[in-house]
């Protein structure tokens, strides 16, 4: 925020003194904003990954529209399963708003499971100040640049700090054998 005097911006944080972990003041109940609007998942993308002679390569994203049910859960607008390669990851395009506020907010948590087994969880919560420069490592920039929403990669990049990921199996990569059908669930908070 900009200081009323026109001076430098002010930034406030609450941290655990001993560990220097940042408190999420909303989830900790320190601040209770008027907010009963859940985050909205706009689209889901799937990207297949592989290596060619030791060099990482990835496919173009396959994009899927979603629709929200009356109960608040989402499903793809298509009925047939998503065609997936032997390994890949999901990217979630989502937005969060709060009551009475026009601008959007980022998600603070995203989770992925496959066949009921947790594979990935990202939390924008509890990291130390020195790691705050790494908190955007989950953004999938090729889509983020043209989206009005937050675009989160449900996979850990090679140099991304582990503190952002309380759940991580195979760096979030979903593996699928030929002919295998897997059921994936994605949650956004």
Task: Specify the residue positions occupied by each region the protein language model found.
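Conserved, short, structured surface segments that act as functional micro-motifs
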Residues: 1-58
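Long, low-complexity serine/threonine/glycine- and acidic-rich segments characteristic of extracellular
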Residues: 47-52, 59-189
